Amino acid sequence: MSNIHVRNNLDAPHAGKDSPLYKMIAGKTGAVSLPSLNMLDYSSLWSADWWGFDSCPVYANLSVEKQNDVLARCNQSLLTEAYFIEKSGLAYSAKMVLTARNTDEAQLFALIGADEAKHLAWIEPYVSADAKQLPRGHFLSFLSNLIEEYPPKLLVYLVQIILEGWGLDHYNRLAKSCAHPELAKLFAAILKDEALHHRSGNVLFDASQLSQRDYSLIEDALQHYSLMVRVGPQGALAIVDEVAGGLSNSDLQSVLVALRHEDETQRKLLLLRQLMNQPLVSRVVEILDEEHCFLPVSLREAVDCFVSSR
């Protein structure tokens, strides 16, 4: 089992409705009614108020066309990220089935994999063909590294307890605020399945079986994850900067204020800490506390992070 290697092939082709397999997949997953991407107004899916742009001077000074472009791109980024997360779930489930310690675990992970395939079929029609070939962002790279390199006993904690738990909050926010009724219903349905995935992680995780190396691997992963959260909404910031044609550092800080970087990032970090703080893993959380991993970086530091990767 130790020789099993699974690759999270995020850029693998995905033909969707153009595939000869589509009717079978759609029939099994219920993904029968397809939205027309040409008719879908991405800028209306989540509002400027939801993002915080309604209080952003930089956004207010853009033309209506550019404001809509910002909203459309930001909203598309939510759907594209969800697409690749669910796609990653296929690789995760495959690895966990192949390395399961018993038939019960193999059954569970096969069922989780079926859920991920279903979610992927639901989201895929809302994502353009080009976007499906372009996995972007540090989080997707981080998730792929976990799935490909980390042992199954740690993945139960890092993926199912922490990332799936994080996903419950994220999908709940998307479902409650989405202005597209079918898409809102879709995210609400995904939320129910993800809750089961998260709970099963709590059942399976046994920290008493962890070695010192396991704890070191967990600490390294959690440091990376918390850092990605600490720097705030870098993706949305990049979209505003690109549409506006390049912003000054003070304008970038203004956008981060509107995006509620300090308050919302702090809320997310506290949630992350709560999910991490499982029995016998509390020492790792204490170490991260000592390293200030659950505090947002300042506005200036968040802007510096963005500018350095421009």
Regions inferred by a protein language model and the residue ranges of each:
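Non-heme di-metal
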Residues: 1-310
